Amino acid sequence: MARGSVSDEEMMELREAFAKVDTDGNGYISFNELNDLFKAACLPLPGYRVREITENLMATGDLDQDGRISFDEFIKIFHGLKSTDVAKTFRKAINKKEGICAIGGTSEQSSVGTQHSYSEEEKYAFVNWINKALENDPDCRHVIPMNPNTNDLFNAVGDGIVLCKMINLSVPDTIDERTINKKKLTPFTIQENLNLALNSASAIGCHVVNIGAEDLKEGKPYLVLGLLWQVIKIGLFADIELSRNEALIALLREGESLEDLMKLSPEELLLRWANYHLENAGCNKIGNFSTDIKDSKAYYHLLEQVAPKGDEEGVPAVVIDMSGLREKDDIQRAECMLQQAERLGCRQFVTATDVVRGNPKLNLAFIANLFNRYPALHKPENQDIDWGALEGETREERTFRNWMNSLGVNPRVNHLYSDLSDALVIFQLYEKIKVPVDWNRVNKPPYPKLGGNMKKLENCNYAVELGKNQAKFSLVGIGGQDLNEGNRTLTLALIWQLMRRYTLNILEEIGGGQKVNDDIIVNWVNETLREAKKSSSISSFKDPKISTSLPVLDLIDAIQPGSINYDLLKTENLNDDEKLNNAKYAISMARKIGARVYALPEDLVEVNPKMVMTVFACLMGKGMKRV
């Protein structure tokens, strides 16, 4: 069964279920993980029955016979076994897994009788993190501090303010604070805040396709926690990237190129970082942040390695007390370790029980926070390194990457070019723009060591073929090899056409199938401005007047009269700072009235015609819905 035949809602549920079983987070389910699942679920089943079910699932699911179940195989299990006893037991086990609260489906989209589950541990961890992050924010005094042992969190997110603040903490300046409604809130102004939060979350790469403002207002636990985890994770991972943290080059291994290191995901870099310090401590390496850290020993040695040694001015030494290592009881040992983490100000995300149970999500967050506070890495001085290769991604590249991630592509795109080199993400994007993909022609990971790149190249050739023949894109001079090798210009040419088609498709759906092009959008913008008696207009998406953002702001006010506070704007003789100030307000206001805008304020100031087109197209979509 191809992924394309699974709804977005169901896909999200399947991903959640998969993550619960895949405790080591390596992207595959092993025989042992299936066994552990049934044990953790405390189902009244005899041991031989658990063994039978596990063997049955492995036999049915492991289609390529590699001894593990991939996500695609997992989807097939769920569809192939829908009505069998094995399937029912499997689902029951997933829903009953310890620490998971199951609640009946209440969303209109969810079928009657489904169960959405959420983790008490996650709620506890996120509440403590948010309390600390927002403790001094006067706009959050009405809800902070929240009690982690109650449902405070699910009520607190209901007005959108906490979500907006957390998004800005993860990616500063995403939301213009002037656009958040803070005082005397009404159902309408709350709805605006939630629009602003959801559309801004989407713009930083959160997958929010199945989450509506109503879900957040009602505080639906599994949706609230899912969104918060994405926002928190983006913030935690922001600096775990070579171009933003050159000291990470210290993690280069012998015979490895800078390019190899740059391809690693934040999770892989964190594991590499932890093992770098464990190696220096003369300890065994770890292979994950779940089963391998359950005894707290790796954490103890990691804390000892990264704790300040007193050799930096103004940073006093912290000597980690290692005596807790001798504790016989795992929980007690974990508690002693966390007391040492607290001395570094890093007791966040995990309890002693989370460590001992090997909760992969919360342990990953704990490690990421420790890295951000105490990386304890030094940029190599003498190594022959091409520092020029370390340039960060451009704004346009970041926008494209965030757009893809917001659509829920799997795997997540961390590095635009290397993560597209097998075209799997591109095929998913084709499906989003209604270009059918023959998944039987697609090679899927894991790729063999010998000939693996040939498999990826075959995918890329098929991706270009689909673009030319099915999507009717202009791909002159672009071959599969260009995608496979990460040719920037040619890869961007394809991605832009995918994003443009996606944007126009939405407009065409709203307009009852009527074809849309640039001229139609420009004419609609000018007509709408004229009808609202606004003085601004645009001649094209390259019009220099767009650099003031006034045509965008006037259009927003035309679509939702009275929404723009013109007192906050500079309208004549603008310098660059004033233009940027207007643009920040414009982008946030567009999101606030319900337009899912991915562009950045700088795109308006610099009049980047591609991104300008997407802004006006999204606003046109919003305006047409209003009619």
Swiss-Prot record:
Keywords: Acetylation, Actin-binding, Calcium, Cell junction, Cell membrane, Cell projection, Chromosomal rearrangement, Cytoplasm, Cytoskeleton, Disease variant, Membrane, Metal-binding, Phosphoprotein, Repeat. InterPro entries: Actinin_actin-bd_CS, CH_dom, CH_dom_sf, EF-hand-dom_pair, EF_Hand_1_Ca_BS, EF_hand_dom, Fimbrin/Plastin. Changing N608S: Found in a patient with isolated coloboma; increases interaction with actin. GO terms for cellular component: actin cytoskeleton; actin filament; actin filament bundle; cell junction; cytoplasm; cytosol; extracellular exosome; extracellular space. One of its GO terms (biological process) is T cell activation involved in immune response. The keyword Ribonucleoprotein does not apply. Residues 120-236, 264-375, 394-503, 515-624 form the Calponin-homology (CH) domain. The modification N6-acetyllysine is found at K76, K88, K294, K297, K361, K472, K542, K579. It is a peripheral membrane protein. Residues 106-379 are annotated as: Actin-binding 1. Phosphorylated on a serine residue in response to costimulation through TCR/CD3 and CD2 or CD28. Serine phosphorylation promotes association with the actin cytoskeleton and targeting to peripheral cell projections. Residues 380-624 are annotated as: Actin-binding 2. Changing S5E: Promotes association with the actin cytoskeleton. Detected in intestinal microvilli, hair cell stereocilia, and fibroblast filopodia, in spleen and other lymph node-containing organs. Expressed in peripheral blood T-lymphocytes, neutrophils, monocytes, B-lymphocytes, and myeloid cells. The modification Phosphotyrosine is found at Y28, Y124. Actin-binding protein. Plays a role in the activation of T-cells in response to costimulation through TCR/CD3 and CD2 or CD28. Modulates the cell surface expression of IL2RA/CD25 and CD69. This is Plastin-2. It comes from Homo sapiens. The gene is LCP1.
